Design a protein with these regions (language model features):
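Binuclear metal-dependent phosphoesterase catalytic core
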Residues: 2, 92-96, 134-171
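Active-site environment of divalent metal-dependent phosphoester hydrolases
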Residues: 10-14, 39-41, 72-79, 107-113, ...
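Internal catalytic-core helix/loop-beta-alpha segment
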Residues: 82-131
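Short, solvent-exposed amphipathic alpha-helical segments in soluble enzyme
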Residues: 21-22, 117, 158
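Hydrophobic/aromatic beta-strand patches that form the interior of the parallel beta-sheet core
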Residues: 32, 67-69, 121-123, 139-141, ...
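Core catalytic region of metal-dependent phosphoesterases/phosphodiesterases
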Residues: 2-95
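Thr-Gly-centered strand-to-loop micro-motif
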Residues: 6, 103, 142-144
Length: 171
């Protein structure tokens, strides 16, 4: 199974467009979105080309592939405008025989993991910082932020053939 794993779009039409271009190029089986899709939140500056109404049709066109979880900036109104579920606090995905736990990261995170078996994969966003480390036998990954990176590079993750690789966009 091939996945694109992204987080923290925060309503940026420009960076969501870059993500859509990558999705079209890579043609993944699923697109995993780890929350904070439309709104920037009170702690963030506005991202480049902040236009949540333009992001809605971009993501809606991918609804058949999207598996999304709620971020700390999502609200019920987001579910009213997006045609795919986006308000669950977490989701589980069986991928190539591994359990993937998907969450935004504002509740569970690599420092406070949910009960998972060794060999599981924990995917979270929220910090806007890329991460790939093992904690107590669980691989923890964070794709960073599509639109408001706090580590200097706009990014997501491509999962293919059992391997994770970071995709970095130039600013």
């Amino acid at each position: 199974m091939k996945l694109i794993i992204a987080s923290d779009i925060h309503g940026s039409a420009y960076w969501c467009g870059k993500l859509v271009e990558l999705i079209e190029k890579e043609d993944p089986d699923r697109v995993v979105l780890l929350g904070d899709l439309l709104y920037h939140g009170p702690r963030n500056d506005l991202p480049r080309d902040y236009a949540p109404k333009q992001v809605i049709p971009m993501l809606s066109a991918l609804q058949e592939k999207i598996l999304a979880v709620r971020g700390n900036c999502e609200a019920e109104v987001d579910q009213m405008v997006l045609p795919f579920p986006c308000l669950a606090d977490y989701a589980l995905l069986d991928c190539d025989g591994k359990t993937m736990y998907l969450t935004h990261g504002h509740h569970a995170n690599p420092d406070h993991l949910p009960p998972l078996t060794k060999g599981s994969i924990f995917l979270s966003g929220h910090t806007h910082v890329k991460l790939d480390k093992e904690v107590e036998g669980i691989r923890c990954l964070n794709p960073g932020s599509v639109s408001i990176p706090k580590d200097g590079s706009h990014s997501c993750i491509v999962f293919e053939n059992g391997e994770f690789r970071f995709h970095i966009w130039e600013d």
